[in-house]
Curated annotation (Swiss-Prot):
Top-rank taxon, per record: Eukaryota
Pathway: Protein modification; protein ubiquitination
Name assigned to this protein: Kelch-like protein 3
Organism of this sequence: Pongo abelii
InterPro entries for this protein: BACK, BTB-kelch_protein, BTB/POZ_dom, Kelch-typ_b-propeller, Kelch_1, KLHL3_BACK, SKP1/BTB/POZ_sf
UniProt keyword list: Actin-binding, Cytoplasm, Cytoskeleton, Kelch repeat, Phosphoprotein, Repeat, Ubl conjugation pathway
Domain BACK span(s) in chain numbering: 152-254
């Protein structure tokens, strides 16, 4: 503040052999430069001692040459060189709009500038022109923080045009790491042929299956089919068809009209079919770009724990960082929600149905991890709490549950592409407090409570989306309602749960290949209504209750050692009936 005294720092220097007369003190006033620039800016605002006028469009800005030259190499070269501008009183700056130039000259005097979504694309090139490299870097940092599947390709193109090398690399890596979501957006569909080829040929492309790459090619061609059809073979050259399952090749790729009508594409399909006929040792001898597995850069993951009872329905959402063993609070749910189904799909976390403390609901909220915000989408057809939720073939399934008066056998599915819910075949048994999981293209509904027999269930049903039918598979060894169900290495785990008043710590695992259940090691604690997720080959069971209190602890199972281990750090809140999902950690 004006008139405020500033503490000076000083240093006394004494040379060896000198007497006291040769002592000297250097005094540093850290506020001096700031005060000086503040006064210069006040002089500028009063148009005092100004010796140059900078003009852009219809905006005229009075300034001091020495200040501009001190902060901008562009102005320094202009004012100290042999150009006519070195003596001119009025200088026009082209290729910069007046408002942006005014902001940048304000920055020269104040060291303050606001970068926003609205101004960053004009601010960065203007800062580059004036060689205000700190502002340019701030713009790059801002764009990097805004990377999202819907804009990363646009930011990549912008970075390329303006030679922002680091931002270009970051945006490209982001596009590769989030390809399944990126391919759904308008930016991807608007790419040029060479840009699509460059992206889908990358070894670093992060896809759970080569199916996504094939689907992306078909979508891009169909977007402007008339002009793009001729590029089909060039694109399919970069799809690693031999790495696709044989069933998918026969049922989907071979049936695609764009493949049927192109001889080169049919050759790629034949190559893939022949690859599947070879013994494994001979497959390894085939070396071409289409048989080489992709090697994506693994993104660190975080675990999201959504809502729950503590002891009433809550809005709180916690995020666990596996690398740092730390829990953080993130954006709360728009309203209280427990007993919901929670899944990760297409780059977002979905919280489906549940109980808000007074009513069973059919509403759905979606979390965007990049923006750290929740939004609402289309509601389900029925109210459901204690439902099961899972993702299969890009559809979100809401299975069973309780509508406030009765247990439900009905099942509905949601397409994020159309934002619509529709019913599929109901289960054979009403199931509330049901656990669900997806293994090898089938959806399983495990245990629960049917409300009619007043018994917890040991039965398990399997849904086949190809036939839209539910069938019973092998029963569990024990009745389990509120079991935590998860999938690890192609097997279905049922953890804890309860049978009447008895809360279990036992765990059993289902092998679809043999249609059998077997016991594995017990958990450290009895748990029902816990959240479950699989990360990096481990199965995590989160919270729940033990029959008397809600639990804040988390434990994980290692199938190699057949042991459960408690996480060293608990959640901030004990919660049961919370949903769990795993997402990529934001860059």
């Amino acid at each position: 503040m004006e008139g405020e005294s500033v503490k000076l720092s000083s240093q006394t220097l004494i040379q060896a052999g000198d007497d006291e007369k040769n002592q000297r003190t250097i005094t540093v006033n850290p506020a001096h430069m700031g005060k000086a620039f503040k006064v210069m800016n006040e002089l500028r605002s009063k148009q005092l001692l100004c010796d140059v006028m900078i003009v852009a469009e219809d905006v005229e800005i009075e300034a001091h040459r020495v200040v501009l030259a001190a902060c901008s190499p562009y102005f320094c070269a202009m004012f100290t060189g042999d150009m006519s501008e070195s003596k001119a009183k009025k200088i026009e700056i082209k290729d910069v709009d007046g408002q942006t130039l005014s902001k940048l000259i304000d920055y020269v005097y104040t060291a303050e500038i606001e970068v926003t979504e609205e101004n960053v694309q004009v601010l960065l090139p203007a800062a580059s022109l004036l060689q205000l490299m700190d502002v340019r870097q701030n713009c790059c940092d801002f764009l990097q923080s805004q990377l999202h599947p819907t804009n990363c390709l646009g930011i990549r193109a912008f970075a390329d045009v303006h030679t922002c090398t680091d931002l270009l690399q970051q945006a490209n890596a982001y596009a590769e790491q989030h390809f399944p979501e990126v391919m759904l957006g308008e930016e991807f569909l608007s790419l040029s042929l060479d840009q699509v080829c460059s992206l889908i040929s990358s070894d670093k492309l992060t896809v759970s299956s080569e199916e996504k790459v094939f689907e992306a090619v078909i979508s891009w061609i169909n977007y402007e089919k008339g002009t793009r059809l001729e590029h089909m073979a060039k694109l399919m050259e970069h799809v690693r068809l031999p790495l696709l399952p044989r069933d998918y090749l026969v049922q989907t790729v071979e049936e695609e009209a764009l493949i049927k009508n192109n001889n080169t594409c049919k050759d790629f399909l034949i190559e893939a079919m022949k690859y599947h006929l070879l013994p494994l040792d001979q497959r390894l001898l085939i070396k071409n770009p289409r048989t080489k597995p992709r090697t994506p850069v693994s993104l660190p993951k975080v675990m999201i724990v959504v809502g729950g009872q503590a002891p009433k329905a809550i809005r709180s959402v916690e995020c666990y960082d596996f690398e740092e063993d730390r829990w953080d609070q993130i954006a709360e749910l728009p309203s209280r929600r427990c007993r919901a189904g929670v899944v990760f799909m297409a780059g977002h976390v979905y919280a489906v149905g549940g109980f808000n403390g007074s009513l069973r609901v059919r509403t759905v909220d979606v979390y965007d991890g990049v923006k750290d915000q929740w939004t609402s989408i289309a509601s389900m057809q029925e109210r459901r709490s204690t439902l099961g939720a899972a993702v299969l073939n890009d559809l979100l399934y809401a299975v069973g549950g309780f509508d406030g008066s009765t247990g439900l056998a009905s099942v509905e599915a949601y397409s994020y592409k159309t934002n619509e819910w529709f019913f599929v075949a109901p289960m054979n048994t009403r199931r509330s407090s049901v656990g669900v999981g997806v293994v090898e293209g089938k959806l399983y509904a495990v245990g629960g409570y049917d409300g009619a027999s007043r018994q917890c269930l040991s039965t398990v049903e399997q849904y086949n989306p190809a036939t839209n039918e539910w069938i019973y598979v092998a029963d569990m060894s024990t009745r389990r309602s509120g079991a935590g169900v998860g999938v690890l290495s192609g097997q279905l785990y049922a953890t804890g749960g309860h049978d009447g008043p008895l809360v279990r710590k036992s765990v059993e695992v289902y092998d679809p290949g043999t249609n059998t259940w077997k016991q594995v090691a017990d958990m450290n604690m009895c748990r029902r209504n816990a959240g479950v997720c699989a990360v990096n080959g481990l199965l995590y069971v989160v919270g729940g209750d033990d029959g008397s209190c809600n639990l804040a602890s988390v434990e994980y199972y290692n199938p190699v050692t057949d042991k459960w281990t408690l996480l060293p750090t608990n959640m901030s809140t004990g919660r049961s009936y919370a949903g769990v999902a795993v997402i990529h950690k934001s860059l």
